Amino acid sequence: MKNIILVIGLSLSCHINFAQDWVQLEDYPGLGRNHPITFSIGTDGYVLAGQNENGTYVKDFYKYDTTTDSWTQLPNFPGYPRGYAYGIAHNGKAYVGFGTSNVFDIGPLDDLWEYDPVSETWTELASCPCGGRLHPAMLEAGGQIFVGLGNNNSGNLDDWWAYDLATDAWAQKADFIAEERHHPYFFSIDDIAYVGFGHGNDIYNDFYKYEPLTDTWTQVASLPAEGRVAGTQFSYNGKGYALSGDGDDHYYLETGEFWQYTPETDSWMSLPVHPGHSKWAPGCFVVGDVLYFTSGLQYDDGNSETLNDLWRFNLDEISSIEIVALETLVYPNPTTDKILLSSPVDYRLFSLKGELVLEGNGASIEVSQLSKGVYFLNTKSKTYKIIKE
């Protein structure tokens, strides 16, 4: 069966409308948590630390064997328990650090640790002279670990640092060129770093690439949707992915949005959403052609739950797609003044009683004059439920 995508706008992005299963797997045995540190080495995925459902920062450590669908608890991380921290894997080892801890009120952390899965041992490496921080971007590109942005007790940050694995030394690089922010999305593709979205004076949808060889930043295509923060991300097969998180009101998205970035075309494509509303501060890891998605806080019918779940999504199925029709993306929703569309379309807006209240053609619809309530926006291909606040 062919998968189908709908092209949005002038080939700047596209949207998949086929149903593809997210499969739920075995929960890990620890308490649910937000901000887990997640990574994969070989056929195993790892979940470490985070903030549990009781609001406590933890240091427990779990390994998931993808060949047997089973979890094993490993010895605790030897550093401080922490949340708002990150980790990456490179050349068969993992590197984790930063975040914050409630032990002795030490606040933002600047440490870096290496994990060897063969010996199951941790080694503390050189701390970053950048100072401690929560919610940074952390990725590997060109054999170096890059860390930057985030926030500390002084506010949001825009600095950028490189760690050299061979010399165990840090060097400051060119600052991020946009607004200071924390909790950005980030990944690397072909030794180039990509960083964006996140929360500063606003919640952003802009995106940037950093080239280590020239130490330069360049803005690339923004996400063709509302700004977002506190999701998870990864790269796979030459593309980058942004999954879940909060929207531009720092509240959950109605669906668990999943986006793919292609650097060759500088474009975004929407993929099948994960079950339920979006998650705040989940984690993920990739083994082979499979994405594993875990943890985070999720809302359902007004209630929230901090999860220890695990879901699987087959990434190789994304490659078989067929472009068939023009579609549009509508945001923000709810709205107070305007409805923005990702491309100009003919539209009609109806009240809940079925009365036509607006019609026209364009990519922006002024609705500030309308009463609060529920409306239905009809385009040639779809009808959207719109909430006017």
What are these regions (language model features)?
Residues 3-4, 18, 92, 238, ...:
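N-terminal cationic leader/targeting segments used for protein routing and processing
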Residues 1-21, 376, 383:
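Bacterial Sec-dependent N-terminal signal peptides
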Residues 9-15, 159, 318-319, 373:
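Intrinsically disordered, low-complexity boundary segments flanking structured domains
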Residues 10, 246, 297, 345, ...:
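A broadly conserved detector of short glycine/acidic/proline-rich loop/turn motifs that flank catalytic sites
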Residues 19-318:
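Kelch-like beta-propeller repeat domains
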Residues 322-389:
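C-terminal outer-membrane/trafficking sorting elements
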